[in-house]
Amino acid sequence: MATINQLVRQPRKRSVEKSDVPALQNCPQRRGVCTRVYTTTPRKPNSALRKVCRVRLTNGFEVSSYIGGEGHNLQEHSVVLIRGGRVKDLPGVRYHTVRGSLDTSGVKGRNQGRSKYGTKRPK
């Protein structure tokens, strides 16, 4: 146990919390350009073809970003907005593309949870 004198001379170190999304640099979202759009398979025990894109951000970072929802219109050189949020069964994918903003279209025919997929309200 440290004495009060020792603590006055050298206070206790605060532990620095490590960010889960370092490429965002404390911003809520970041803009970037798709360098590669591809599908990948998840870890065991799941099985699927998950849609992922590699994005070069405006701050110079290059990250993998998950494309949620059914169907998408992204290709190389598409400008996308990414947010934080990892995909548990895809190693190395720590970001999500924001649907319905910039070059990313919303999900067609979506009626529930529309705000998460950038779908306008049906008339």
From Swiss-Prot:
GO CC list: small ribosomal subunit
Record bears the keyword tRNA-binding: yes
GO biological process, one term: translation
One Pfam family matching this protein: Ribosom_S12_S23
Keywords: Methylation, Ribonucleoprotein, Ribosomal protein, RNA-binding, rRNA-binding, tRNA-binding
Keyword Ribonucleoprotein part of the UniProt annotation: yes
Span list, region Disordered: 1-22, 100-123
Chain intervals with Basic residues compositional bias: 111-123
Residue numbers of 3-methylthioaspartic acid PTMs: D89
A molecular function (GO) term: tRNA binding
Membership in a protein family: Belongs to the universal ribosomal protein uS12 family.
Oligomeric and partner information: Part of the 30S ribosomal subunit. Contacts proteins S8 and S17. May interact with IF1 in the 30S initiation complex.
General function of this protein: With S4 and S5 plays an important role in translational accuracy.
Record's protein name: Small ribosomal subunit protein uS12
Organism: Pseudomonas putida (strain GB-1)
Gene name for this UniProt entry: rpsL
